[in-house]
């Protein structure tokens, strides 16, 4: 039976109030239209006016979309997050890596998108500070507010914040206008197009913490709390900053104060130190979060705090709170069936929970900085994160983007490692690459001295020597065993390893589909080989499989009209493939028994079929159409196999632990579907129907 995931928006406007700070999600009321990347006349004349937005500070001389007098009545109504690429057709000439969607430099007419939003600020307090925060726009985003040019962010993955306080209309509508240009790709995977992450209206006091400016550091029983404080008032200010650490129940654990003297426009950092004898530690099994109350000039801001230690070393791999933890991880791109890159927060949480069900405790954000929502969710759910930089380099632009990632991630206990790059083939064997890596690593340590850095290596032997922690992309590419023998002091983990997955439910070759490599591939390129290696070598930190969930783009080894990668452990809708049960058996204590393939093999009657079982039972017995095929001992981290001639009917597997029957799994040949059965699950602001 086919299953369908339907995502329904149930809340389009949300406000998150944190004491004096209010963050309002700007979700509904947006207008959208395509511009044009090659023809200014079809791009609403943007930038071609006699006085354009770069020559004069306001668009009063323009009739373009950033002008209040512009008529957008013919534009589409959309909600944000929004990925316009999902609505575009496919074409064989389009980008293979981006899933053959007609977006990119070949398609100027569908690669620029314009957004307009009217915001009512008639009740805004003139004594307060207001900013707009965009968690991510793909890409090359230009922002105007009430006709004033706010700025341009070329990266599709950077959080961008603009002070709008001086430009507010308190007696009329306020116009927010955004132009996004997705002509160029930043990655080699589907990236979407448009305002694909959340947009926030942020209200604070005039003297306030900077965005991402409240952060903590736990070292040797002492919690250092810091608040980078900005003075956006017109007066010199003696800013009194008070900190209180509270339990989940609101009990005060510690408190302290500091003062920073700030001239108008100046920024300084207040801090305090709390000695905490027996903190409740944040852990993957108990993701406990304190609350830090920071009061600045009478305004209070609340920040989640997770206290924990995390380190990688050469002897034990990864240690969390002083004990060895094996990272059971997956790589993850940010896109999903139906919504593309514009994943609502509730769906992000649902995806993480589906992965946790099979034992996943770690996610590598491949290959770009995570959306802030994912970090918040993993803080709450107890999943550790490797946050990854998009583009290696050491000039001002590269460092700005690197700092953006670190500032937004350093307060999250889920983040345990900063990745400065991935498979940089042009640098991996070049001494210049080593210099770049060293300078990037030093800069990260300056911004965050509490975490190590990593580099995901495709096989080169020069650049990745500089990384604190060596990330091996595939055992077969990196000669891991010999490198460990030569350099036992190196700290290492599997940053990528193959899942060997294919199209869910496909077991024989057919056009546009990919049977699992695990049943047809070489022993060096299957999921069992990857897990067994990292399980049996405790000096490694664990492994991150490629990938946790199918994603659009990179349909290798297939090509058009196939458009998504099928190496995910879960398919594009989040349904588990056979390999999900293999990992669940290996990674959890819950008894697992799973038979493959399915038993609807029309056209293969009378053929010998290899029937596999994934399980963590001690022994499994299999019968086919009532015939006992035998009872076998289950190899740890492996599979069992029986040969059965296909005949419509029934397969029954029985699992035994310590000689006692604990599980029975039955699959059988089915006829045509007679009805559709749907169930719903609501997570946050979305409902999933399957």
Where do the PLM segments sit?
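Beta-strand-rich structural segments
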Residues: 225-229, 611-615, 686-690
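Accessory beta-strand-rich segments of carbohydrate-active enzymes
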Residues: 33-37, 52, 61, 86-91, ...
